[in-house]
Design a protein with these regions (language model features):
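Core catalytic region of metal-dependent phosphoesterases/phosphodiesterases
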Residues: 13, 18-105, 211
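Binuclear metal-dependent phosphoesterase catalytic core
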Residues: 4-6, 101-106, 180-184, 196-226
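Catalytic cores of nucleotide-sugar-dependent glycosyltransferases that transfer UDP/GDP/TDP-activated
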Residues: 13-16, 126-136, 161, 166, ...
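Active-site-proximal segments of metal-dependent phosphoesterases and phosphodiesterases across multiple
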Residues: 42-57, 148-185
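Active-site environment of divalent metal-dependent phosphoester hydrolases
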Residues: 17-24, 42-47, 71-82, 102-103, ...
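Active-site-proximal loop/helix segment associated with metal-binding centers of metalloenzymes
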Residues: 108-168
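A short helix->loop->beta-strand "cap" motif at the edges of active sites that frequently abuts
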Residues: 64-68, 185-188, 206
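Structural motif
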Residues: 9-10, 34, 108-109, 150-151, ...
Length: 226
C-alpha cells in the first residue's frame, strides 16, 4: 500500500466552533475520504450560532460522502450527547466517545479522548452553555480499552507537551488525565486543538501537532504517514 497517497485522503482538523461553512468549503475543495476532528466541533443542535461577523452559521454540517469523526471539546452542548458514547449525530458525522477507537484502512488504530476545562467558565451559564461533563474523569480513564493505539485525537493535550508557557490554558486536570493516556499507549502520533495555535513537537517518541481553528491558517493537515 502507498501510505503517503493514502494519507492524502485523510484530514485532521482543529477547532470548528460550528463554522460548518468553512468545513464544507474545505471538504468540497479537497474531497477527503475521512476527517478526524480535534474537539470544539460546535455541536449545539438547539442553538442558532453566529460567526464572528454576526452572520448565522449553517446549523448542520454538509459533507457529502466524507466521513467525519470528532471528539468533544469544552464548547459543546453536553445535554445532547454522552461524552463516553459514540453516535452518528448527522449523516456521516460521528461523535466518538471518550476511549472509543477507529480502525483506519491502513491498519492503524485511532483513540479519541475529548474534553478540556473552559477558561471562560465564569462568563457561561451552567446547564446552558457550560457543562461539568467537559472534564475527563477517573471513570473515563477506567474505561480505556486495552488495545494497541497508533494515533490519539484529543481536544487538549498531555501536560508533557510544551504547547504554551505560563498561560492559564496550559495546565488543567484534563492534561494530567491525558498524561495517563500517553503513558498507557505510547502512540506514535497525537493531534489536538483547544489552544488555537499551530505547533509541532516530539515527546516520549510521540510526534504531536497542535492545530488552530476554522478560518485560520494551519487549522487542518493531512494525516501523517507511518
Amino acid at each position: 500500500m502507498d501510505y503517503c497517497a493514502y494519507c492524502e485522503d485523510i484530514f485532521v482538523l482543529g477547532d470548528v466552533h460550528a463554522d460548518f461553512r468553512s468545513l464544507a468549503n474545505l471538504i468540497n475543495r479537497k474531497h477527503p475520504r475521512i476527517v478526524l476532528q480535534c474537539g470544539d466541533f460546535g455541536y449545539w443542535p438547539g442553538f442558532k450560532v453566529k460567526n464572528r461577523r454576526g452572520v448565522l452559521k449553517d446549523s448542520r454540517p454538509r459533507i457529502g460522502e466524507t466521513k467525519l469523526y470528532w471528539c468533544e471539546g469544552n464548547h459543546e452542548d453536553y445535554s445532547c450527547f454522552r461524552a463516553h458514547e459514540t453516535s452518528e449525530v448527522f449523516p456521516n458525522v460521528f461523535h466518538m466517545g471518550r476511549g472509543s477507537t477507529l480502525a483506519l484502512p491502513d491498519g492503524r488504530t485511532v483513540l479519541f479522548m475529548g474534553g478540556a476545562l473552559s477558561v471562560d467558565k465564569a462568563w457561561r451559564t451552567p446547564g446552558y452553555d457550560w457543562f461539568p461533563e467537559e472534564s475527563i474523569t477517573t471513570g473515563d480513564l477506567d474505561r480505556l480499552p486495552d488495545v494497541h493505539v497508533d494515533i490519539v485525537i484529543s481536544h487538549t493535550c498531555p501536560a508533557e507537551f510544551e504547547i504554551m508557557d505560563e498561560d492559564v490554558l496550559a495546565r488543567d486536570s484534563c492534561q494530567q488525565a491525558l498524561s495517563h493516556v500517553l503513558a498507557k499507549y505510547h502512540p506514535s502520533l497525537w493531534y489536538f486543538g483547544h489552544f488555537h495555535r499551530f505547533k509541532k513537537g516530539c515527546t516520549m517518541g510521540c510526534r504531536w501537532t497542535a492545530l488552530t481553528m476554522a478560518g485560520c491558517s494551519n487549522w487542518w493537515e493531512h494525516l501523517a504517514a507511518k
